[in-house]
UniProtKB/Swiss-Prot annotation:
Residues 27-68, 117-169 form the WAP domain. Glycans are attached at N67, N170. Disulfide bonds join C27-C57, C36-C61, C43-C56, C49-C65, C125-C157, C135-C161, C143-C156, C149-C165. This is Perlwapin-like protein. Pfam families: WAP.
Length: 225
């Protein structure tokens, strides 16, 4: 019995000194943290293990058979920190939505644009010759500028009832249609009225009305007695 315990202590010292069975994979792990259970002596060498890929390892409490490719108990040692090797591949940056308004790219339109013809300043509006007219605003289309005219080439010109779109004329034609200025009217001669003279009473006696006499009447045709 004493030889058995001496053998166990000797094997334990060999594992501690030489790295637990020549640095085999399952023998790296030690059984630590709790009390050792009884009956941990299972093998003395790898040949005592029944498995093909098993080795006889010391786990901290005794010698047991373990597979070469598995570990008995998770290691309590700290994991090794691997050095960070900078990658040569470009890193994909995460897309962060921007709070600023995005500027839309300008895309030229394929549809033909309608060019509005604006009359040149040399073209003038025709002269308004009618001074008075009945304005029917139900059929009257006013304008403010030449851009309001729907027909190309027309110009917003003054009219009797306001402004409306008209075709302009050249400056030479405009002078021909200018209205001749009215001549100043000559005032009519004023006739002075003669004031009425007050009537003076006459010194002659007033005329008496004549009364016809009975003899002056014509009795022809009267009844005879």
């Amino acid at each position: 019995m004493n030889h058995l315990w001496l053998f166990i202590v000797t094997v334990s010292c060999i594992y501690l000194v030489y790295g637990q069975g020549e640095e085999s994979v399952p023998c790296k792990v030690k059984f630590m943290g709790t009390a050792c259970p009884l009956g941990r002596l299972v093998c003395e060498e790898d040949g005592d293990c029944l498995g093909v890929n098993q080795v006889c390892c010391y786990d901290g409490c005794g010698t047991t058979c373990h597979n070469k490719t598995t570990t008995l108990i998770p290691s309590t040692t700290q994991p090794q920190i691997q050095p960070i090797i900078p990658s040569t591949q470009p890193q994909i940056q995460p897309i962060i939505p921007s709070t600023q308004p995005q500027i839309q790219p300008f895309i030229p339109s394929t549809q033909p644009q309608i060019q509005r013809i604006i009359p040149s300043p040399e073209l003038l509006c025709p002269v308004v010759t009618v001074r008075y007219a009945f304005c029917r605003f139900s059929t009257y289309t006013p304008c403010h500028t030449s851009n309001d005219c729907a027909v190309p080439g027309m110009k917003c010109c003054p009219d009797v009832c306001g402004k409306r779109c008209k075709f302009p004329i050249n400056s030479t034609d405009h002078q021909q249609f200018q209205q001749t200025p009215l001549k100043p009217t000559v005032p009519l001669p004023q006739y002075q009225q003669t004031p009425l003279q007050p009537t003076v009473p006459s010194s002659q006696p007033p005329l008496q009305p004549t009364v016809p006499s009975p003899q002056s009447y014509n009795y022809k045709g009267a009844c005879s007695t």
